[in-house]
């Protein structure tokens, strides 16, 4: 029995050894587990990579870019020398407001918003009541002054000359702007400097074949308005000096109503060429590139005008000098306030104001007279 037990135990031991030798090692079957995690991470990582490109850091500029930060509202604190409140019915009272007329030399919607902000701010500063209106044409603003339906105006340069000659309107402030220029401008080194003058530019559709004044014959042409200095009066003088009769040499002409409208018409091919202020194509207030991103490529400049004194603010001659003084003070205060600056920038791209004497435009008027231009004959 004992011998049989010994033999049985020996057989069991041999059987275990055989099984052990035939079975795969435990470490060999578990080794893939150790190598699998890196394999899974490596193959899945590319599918998760777009998360990095969608990170908030790359989206932030489109959500809230610094340039879109709204400007602060204008500070309209009451002026120290504000006049006493007018009696009912007097000029400046609620039922007889001081009317400010603005010429439609740009986007009338933007002009209306900015003009309303100016009227409201002057009301708070002076204790007087102001009301704004945008003329349907340049001439409409002039005639409102002549009829004393408006007492304050923001006219362009030539309209100021007309209003001076016809109704005795006097300039009080001239606009100071960062000088806009282009590559053809002899004064391009002044670009960005604050100056009381500007220039006009002749533009053409890039596909029109126009590169000089001589090429304009037989083409269609867009002006701004018959009372626009850089968009009509001065360009006509220059056209005639370069052998182009603006009344006979074009296949068609039209008055587009504003400088941005001229640029848009040329861009769309409604006019082969036209004239605007420098440089309406990239002007911040006109903001044409927001609607037509390629406008500077499809519209080309081929000539520029001489210097033209800037526009500004004027008064009718019968307005009380004390009221004139306080209005000037209020406008200068707005021009020195960040919120006020933003309003003036949106209005007509003003950067600042400079007080001027009544004879400020006399030299320019003399140039026009020498060229045979009589402002009194051009009131439309």
Predicted regions and their residues:
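Bacterial N-terminal signal peptides
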Residues: 10-20
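Short, glycine-/small- and polar/acidic-enriched structural segments
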Residues: 42, 64-208
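Bilobed "Venus flytrap"/periplasmic-binding protein-like clamshell domains
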Residues: 95-125, 131, 135, 158, ...
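Periplasmic-binding protein-like
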Residues: 103, 176-188, 196-199, 253-256, ...
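A ligand-binding cleft/hinge motif common to bilobed small-molecule-binding domains
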Residues: 157-168, 235-241, 267, 272-296
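Ligand-binding "clamshell"
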Residues: 163-190, 246, 284-302, 371, ...
């Amino acid at each position: 029995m004992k011998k049989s037990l010994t033999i049985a135990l020996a057989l069991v031991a041999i059987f275990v050894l055989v099984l052990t030798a035939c079975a795969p090692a435990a470490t060999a079957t578990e080794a893939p587990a150790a190598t699998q995690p890196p394999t899974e991470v490596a193959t899945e990582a590319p599918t998760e990579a777009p998360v990095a490109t969608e990170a908030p850091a790359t989206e932030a500029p489109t959500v809230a870019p610094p340039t879109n930060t709204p400007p602060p509202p204008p500070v309209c604190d009451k002026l120290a020398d504000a006049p006493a409140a007018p009696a009912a019915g007097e000029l400046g009272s609620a039922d007889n407001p001081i009317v400010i007329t603005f010429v439609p030399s740009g986007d009338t919607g933007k002009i209306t918003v900015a003009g309303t902000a100016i009227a409201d701010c002057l009301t708070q500063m002076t204790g007087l009541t102001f009301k704004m209106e945008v003329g349907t044409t340049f001439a409409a603003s002039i005639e409102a002054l002549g009829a004393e339906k408006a007492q304050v105006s923001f006219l362009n340069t030539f309209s100021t000359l007309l209003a001076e000659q016809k109704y005795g309107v006097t300039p009080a402030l001239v606009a100071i702007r960062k000088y806009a220029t282009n590559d053809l401008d002899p004064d391009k080194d002044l670009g960005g400097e604050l100056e009381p003058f500007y220039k006009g530019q002749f533009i053409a559709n890039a596909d029109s074949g126009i590169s000089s004044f001589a090429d304009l014959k037989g083409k269609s042409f867009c002006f701004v308005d018959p009372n626009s200095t850089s968009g009509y009066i001065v360009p006509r003088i220059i056209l005639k000096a370069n052998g182009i009769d603006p009344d006979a040499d074009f296949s068609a002409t039209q008055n587009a109503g504003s400088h941005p409208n001229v640029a848009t018409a040329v861009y769309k091919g409604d006019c082969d060429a036209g004239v605007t202020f420098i440089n309406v194509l990239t002007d911040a207030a006109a903001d044409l590139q927001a609607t037509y991103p390629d406008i500077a490529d499809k519209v080309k400049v081929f000539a520029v005008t001489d210097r033209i004194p800037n526009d500004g603010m004027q008064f009718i001659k019968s307005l009380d000098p004390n009221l004139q003084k306080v209005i000037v003070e209020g406008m200068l205060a707005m021009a020195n306030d960040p919120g006020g600056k933003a309003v003036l920038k949106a209005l007509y791209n003003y950067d600042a104001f400079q007080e001027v004497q009544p004879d400020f435009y006399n030299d320019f008027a003399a140039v026009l007279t020498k060229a045979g231009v009589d402002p009194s004959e051009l009131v439309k």
